Amino acid sequence: MALRVLFFATGLLTSSSLAAAPDLTGIWTLNGPGTESEILLTEEGLRIQSEYDLLVDDPSLFCVPASASRIWANPGARILIQQSEEAVLISYELFDLRRDIPIGDESAMTDMPSTKNIDGTYFQEMGSSFAGYVDERLIIESRNHSLGYIRTSRGIPQSRNTVTNEVLRIEGDTLHLTHTYFDDTLYENPIVMDYFFRRTDESEITLYECREANYDWFNELNAPKEEETQ
Protein backbone atom coordinates (compact mmCIF):
# COMPACT_ATOMS: atom_id res chain seq x y z
CA MET A 1 0.00 0.00 0.00
CA ALA A 2 3.03 2.30 -0.29
CA LEU A 3 1.55 4.57 -2.95
CA ARG A 4 -1.63 5.15 -0.94
CA VAL A 5 0.38 5.94 2.19
CA LEU A 6 2.47 8.41 0.20
CA PHE A 7 -0.61 10.13 -1.13
CA PHE A 8 -2.36 10.63 2.19
CA ALA A 9 0.85 11.63 3.97
CA THR A 10 0.98 14.77 1.85
CA GLY A 11 -2.18 16.16 3.47
CA LEU A 12 -4.32 18.67 1.63
CA LEU A 13 -3.14 19.08 -1.97
CA THR A 14 -4.29 22.48 -3.23
CA SER A 15 -3.53 24.68 -6.20
CA SER A 16 -0.40 25.89 -4.39
CA SER A 17 1.12 22.48 -5.12
CA LEU A 18 1.35 23.46 -8.80
CA ALA A 19 4.89 24.55 -7.98
CA ALA A 20 5.66 20.82 -7.84
CA ALA A 21 3.64 19.99 -10.96
CA PRO A 22 5.30 18.30 -13.92
CA ASP A 23 4.38 19.64 -17.36
CA LEU A 24 2.06 16.91 -18.62
CA THR A 25 0.19 19.13 -21.06
CA GLY A 26 0.09 17.77 -24.58
CA ILE A 27 -0.97 14.79 -26.65
CA TRP A 28 0.53 11.42 -25.85
CA THR A 29 0.47 7.93 -27.36
CA LEU A 30 1.43 4.59 -25.86
CA ASN A 31 5.05 3.66 -26.52
CA GLY A 32 5.37 -0.09 -26.15
CA PRO A 33 3.36 -2.75 -24.30
CA GLY A 34 4.40 -1.80 -20.77
CA THR A 35 4.83 -4.23 -17.87
CA GLU A 36 2.71 -5.71 -15.11
CA SER A 37 3.34 -7.44 -11.80
CA GLU A 38 2.32 -11.04 -11.20
CA ILE A 39 -1.47 -11.28 -11.00
CA LEU A 40 -2.74 -13.56 -8.24
CA LEU A 41 -6.52 -13.61 -7.86
CA THR A 42 -8.51 -14.56 -4.77
CA GLU A 43 -11.24 -17.18 -4.90
CA GLU A 44 -13.77 -14.44 -5.73
CA GLY A 45 -11.51 -13.00 -8.41
CA LEU A 46 -11.10 -16.43 -9.97
CA ARG A 47 -14.85 -16.98 -9.90
CA ILE A 48 -15.52 -13.76 -11.80
CA GLN A 49 -12.74 -14.53 -14.26
CA SER A 50 -14.10 -18.05 -14.91
CA GLU A 51 -17.50 -16.61 -15.84
CA TYR A 52 -16.03 -14.04 -18.25
CA ASP A 53 -16.50 -14.60 -21.98
CA LEU A 54 -14.41 -12.23 -24.11
CA LEU A 55 -16.68 -12.60 -27.11
CA VAL A 56 -19.76 -11.60 -25.10
CA ASP A 57 -18.71 -9.70 -21.98
CA ASP A 58 -16.01 -7.33 -23.25
CA PRO A 59 -17.49 -3.87 -22.48
CA SER A 60 -15.67 -2.43 -25.49
CA LEU A 61 -18.23 -4.15 -27.70
CA PHE A 62 -20.76 -1.64 -26.37
CA CYS A 63 -18.48 1.42 -26.51
CA VAL A 64 -18.01 1.22 -22.74
CA PRO A 65 -14.58 1.54 -21.09
CA ALA A 66 -13.77 -1.67 -19.22
CA SER A 67 -11.48 0.21 -16.80
CA ALA A 68 -9.05 3.11 -16.71
CA SER A 69 -6.21 0.65 -17.24
CA ARG A 70 -7.82 -0.64 -20.43
CA ILE A 71 -8.15 2.91 -21.77
CA TRP A 72 -4.58 3.95 -20.95
CA ALA A 73 -3.20 0.81 -22.60
CA ASN A 74 -4.91 1.13 -25.98
CA PRO A 75 -2.24 1.17 -28.73
CA GLY A 76 -2.38 4.06 -31.19
CA ALA A 77 -5.10 6.00 -29.37
CA ARG A 78 -4.12 9.57 -28.54
CA ILE A 79 -4.49 11.04 -25.06
CA LEU A 80 -4.71 14.79 -24.42
CA ILE A 81 -3.73 16.06 -20.96
CA GLN A 82 -4.60 19.60 -19.87
CA GLN A 83 -3.69 21.10 -16.49
CA SER A 84 -5.15 24.01 -14.53
CA GLU A 85 -4.93 25.10 -10.91
CA GLU A 86 -8.26 23.43 -10.11
CA ALA A 87 -8.23 20.25 -12.17
CA VAL A 88 -6.59 17.91 -14.63
CA LEU A 89 -8.59 17.11 -17.76
CA ILE A 90 -7.63 13.92 -19.59
CA SER A 91 -9.27 13.44 -22.98
CA TYR A 92 -8.97 9.91 -24.32
CA GLU A 93 -9.49 9.48 -28.04
CA LEU A 94 -10.81 5.97 -27.41
CA PHE A 95 -14.60 6.18 -26.95
CA ASP A 96 -14.35 10.02 -26.86
CA LEU A 97 -13.88 9.96 -23.08
CA ARG A 98 -13.39 13.13 -21.02
CA ARG A 99 -12.02 12.64 -17.50
CA ASP A 100 -12.25 15.71 -15.25
CA ILE A 101 -10.22 15.22 -12.05
CA PRO A 102 -10.26 17.88 -9.29
CA ILE A 103 -7.05 18.89 -7.53
CA GLY A 104 -7.34 18.50 -3.76
CA ASP A 105 -7.80 15.91 -1.07
CA GLU A 106 -10.53 13.28 -0.74
CA SER A 107 -13.15 15.96 -0.04
CA ALA A 108 -12.72 17.20 -3.63
CA MET A 109 -14.00 13.88 -4.99
CA THR A 110 -17.71 13.66 -5.79
CA ASP A 111 -19.99 10.62 -5.86
CA MET A 112 -20.34 11.03 -9.62
CA PRO A 113 -17.94 9.29 -11.99
CA SER A 114 -15.11 11.53 -13.15
CA THR A 115 -15.42 10.32 -16.75
CA LYS A 116 -18.07 10.85 -19.40
CA ASN A 117 -18.12 10.76 -23.17
CA ILE A 118 -18.89 13.73 -25.40
CA ASP A 119 -22.57 12.74 -25.41
CA GLY A 120 -22.68 13.19 -21.63
CA THR A 121 -22.85 9.50 -20.66
CA TYR A 122 -20.97 8.82 -17.41
CA PHE A 123 -18.92 5.67 -16.84
CA GLN A 124 -18.55 4.31 -13.31
CA GLU A 125 -16.05 1.76 -14.65
CA MET A 126 -13.50 4.61 -14.60
CA GLY A 127 -14.24 5.45 -10.96
CA SER A 128 -14.49 8.77 -9.10
CA SER A 129 -11.14 10.51 -8.76
CA PHE A 130 -9.17 13.27 -7.07
CA ALA A 131 -5.54 14.24 -7.58
CA GLY A 132 -2.56 16.19 -6.28
CA TYR A 133 1.06 16.97 -7.06
CA VAL A 134 3.92 15.52 -5.01
CA ASP A 135 7.62 15.81 -5.86
CA GLU A 136 7.00 16.60 -9.54
CA ARG A 137 4.51 13.78 -9.92
CA LEU A 138 0.77 13.81 -10.49
CA ILE A 139 -0.95 11.29 -8.21
CA ILE A 140 -4.55 10.31 -8.96
CA GLU A 141 -6.65 8.21 -6.59
CA SER A 142 -9.88 6.63 -7.83
CA ARG A 143 -12.68 4.84 -5.97
CA ASN A 144 -16.37 3.98 -6.46
CA HIS A 145 -15.74 1.73 -9.44
CA SER A 146 -18.36 -0.54 -10.95
CA LEU A 147 -17.59 -4.05 -12.15
CA GLY A 148 -15.12 -3.90 -15.02
CA TYR A 149 -11.98 -5.57 -16.32
CA ILE A 150 -8.44 -4.25 -16.09
CA ARG A 151 -7.37 -6.87 -18.62
CA THR A 152 -10.18 -7.69 -21.04
CA SER A 153 -8.25 -10.41 -22.88
CA ARG A 154 -7.93 -12.40 -19.64
CA GLY A 155 -10.97 -11.24 -17.70
CA ILE A 156 -9.00 -9.72 -14.80
CA PRO A 157 -11.78 -7.97 -12.84
CA GLN A 158 -12.26 -4.85 -10.75
CA SER A 159 -15.14 -4.26 -8.32
CA ARG A 160 -16.86 -1.56 -6.27
CA ASN A 161 -14.21 -2.24 -3.60
CA THR A 162 -11.33 -1.43 -5.95
CA VAL A 163 -9.12 1.57 -5.20
CA THR A 164 -6.47 2.70 -7.68
CA ASN A 165 -3.46 5.00 -7.76
CA GLU A 166 -2.04 6.48 -10.94
CA VAL A 167 1.37 8.13 -10.61
CA LEU A 168 2.43 10.18 -13.65
CA ARG A 169 5.90 11.63 -14.04
CA ILE A 170 8.11 12.92 -16.83
CA GLU A 171 11.44 11.24 -17.59
CA GLY A 172 13.17 13.08 -20.41
CA ASP A 173 10.72 13.04 -23.34
CA THR A 174 8.72 10.15 -21.87
CA LEU A 175 5.58 10.14 -19.74
CA HIS A 176 5.77 7.31 -17.23
CA LEU A 177 2.57 5.99 -15.64
CA THR A 178 2.55 3.57 -12.72
CA HIS A 179 -1.01 2.30 -12.24
CA THR A 180 -1.72 0.27 -9.09
CA TYR A 181 -4.93 -1.63 -8.29
CA PHE A 182 -5.85 -2.45 -4.67
CA ASP A 183 -8.72 -4.83 -3.86
CA ASP A 184 -8.40 -7.46 -1.14
CA THR A 185 -11.60 -9.14 -2.32
CA LEU A 186 -10.13 -9.85 -5.77
CA TYR A 187 -6.32 -9.72 -5.62
CA GLU A 188 -3.89 -11.55 -3.34
CA ASN A 189 -1.49 -8.63 -3.85
CA PRO A 190 -1.86 -5.18 -5.43
CA ILE A 191 -1.56 -5.28 -9.22
CA VAL A 192 1.05 -2.83 -10.55
CA MET A 193 1.23 -1.84 -14.21
CA ASP A 194 3.78 0.47 -15.82
CA TYR A 195 3.20 2.27 -19.12
CA PHE A 196 5.31 4.63 -21.19
CA PHE A 197 4.01 7.32 -23.54
CA ARG A 198 5.67 9.59 -26.09
CA ARG A 199 4.62 13.18 -26.66
CA THR A 200 3.35 13.88 -30.19
CA ASP A 201 3.46 17.07 -32.26
CA GLU A 202 -0.30 16.98 -32.81
CA SER A 203 -2.52 19.79 -31.55
CA GLU A 204 -5.84 17.94 -31.22
CA ILE A 205 -7.35 14.49 -30.99
CA THR A 206 -9.92 13.24 -33.47
CA LEU A 207 -13.41 11.99 -32.70
CA TYR A 208 -13.64 8.24 -32.26
CA GLU A 209 -17.40 8.05 -32.81
CA CYS A 210 -17.72 4.52 -31.48
CA ARG A 211 -20.45 2.22 -32.74
CA GLU A 212 -21.40 -1.03 -31.05
CA ALA A 213 -19.49 -3.95 -32.51
CA ASN A 214 -19.08 -7.68 -32.08
CA TYR A 215 -16.53 -10.45 -32.45
CA ASP A 216 -18.13 -12.00 -35.55
CA TRP A 217 -14.82 -11.51 -37.36
CA PHE A 218 -13.11 -13.60 -34.66
CA ASN A 219 -15.68 -16.38 -34.88
CA GLU A 220 -15.42 -16.42 -38.68
CA LEU A 221 -11.63 -16.49 -38.51
CA ASN A 222 -11.67 -19.49 -36.19
CA ALA A 223 -14.59 -21.35 -37.77
CA PRO A 224 -13.66 -24.76 -39.22
CA LYS A 225 -13.14 -24.78 -42.97
CA GLU A 226 -15.77 -26.58 -45.05
CA GLU A 227 -13.33 -29.31 -45.99
CA GLU A 228 -12.53 -29.84 -42.30
CA THR A 229 -16.18 -30.61 -41.53
CA GLN A 230 -16.60 -33.18 -44.26
Question: What label would you give each PLM region?
Answer:
Residues 14-17:
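N-terminal signal peptide c-region/cleavage motif recognized by signal peptidases
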Residues 19-230:
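Hydrophobic small-molecule pocket/channel-lining residues, especially in calycin-type beta-barrels
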Residues 2-9:
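Sec-dependent signal peptide recognition
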